[in-house]
């Protein structure tokens, strides 16, 4: 059976999607977001892909940019993946729903079992779903409703699934993440702390917690691309981003920290976990 939580972060592949020019031409402004430097955003995205491939040793699958999908690089919202199963989401924004098509095909090609939501009353953004290795928490937010959370529970029946109110405009994973199999990291805002308190009440598992000054710093990815026994990685915001949170992240001594910047992509609403999907095509014990 193994140790509870040991499946967290197991991965062999990462999926990303290129940054289209349309990301800088109206989509952000229409959403009230600041102007975006396209070249810088594309550089950030290229560095992220390089770290996933070279530093973490993952097989990188890169979908081409599509001008009709300005927010296509935020493909973390399009699927929830655990083991060999991928739940294709139904994003809250109707304009984003075509983003799932290319992701679905890529995941099928990698051999994952595809589950469709199939309920027009459900909304689900993938970055509202936090998997701890033992259970799922689904943020009930502007982006994700109760029906979406119910479909997560129906899809991943081997795990407990609990809902957590998100009281800000963020997704759940924009407020908290996993710094290890037993450690929840969270921002210091009231919304982030409320979410962590709710999770503590709902869970049957004890998690340590680490509070970071910046909510966005808690949007990190705990990854174990190697074989069991090798040190895991924590892909996190750094490289000049969120300097106030870097010292606190050093307290996570059981991981190798891999910093990456996405401050320009953040202007389009991207958090770190929205910019890639990680999965394992290796057999699971």
From Swiss-Prot:
Annotated GO CC locations: mitochondrion
Keywords: Cytoplasm, Hydrolase, Mitochondrion
Organism for this UniProt entry: Bos taurus (Bovine)
Presence of keyword Repeat: no
PANTHER family (alphabetical): DIMETHYLARGININE DIMETHYLAMINOHYDROLASE, N(G),N(G)-DIMETHYLARGININE DIMETHYLAMINOHYDROLASE 2
Protein name: Putative hydrolase DDAH2
PTM section of the record: Phosphorylated by TBK1. Phosphorylation inhibits the translocation into the mitochondrion upon Sendai viral infection.
UniProt function note: Putative hydrolase with unknown substrate. Does not hydrolyze N(G),N(G)-dimethyl-L-arginine (ADMA) which acts as an inhibitor of NOS. In endothelial cells, induces expression of vascular endothelial growth factor (VEGF) via phosphorylation of the transcription factor SP1 by PKA in a process that is independent of NO and NO synthase. Similarly, enhances pancreatic insulin secretion through SP1-mediated transcriptional up-regulation of secretagogin/SCGN, an insulin vesicle docking protein.
Active-site residue list: 171, 276
Annotated localization: Cytoplasm; Mitochondrion
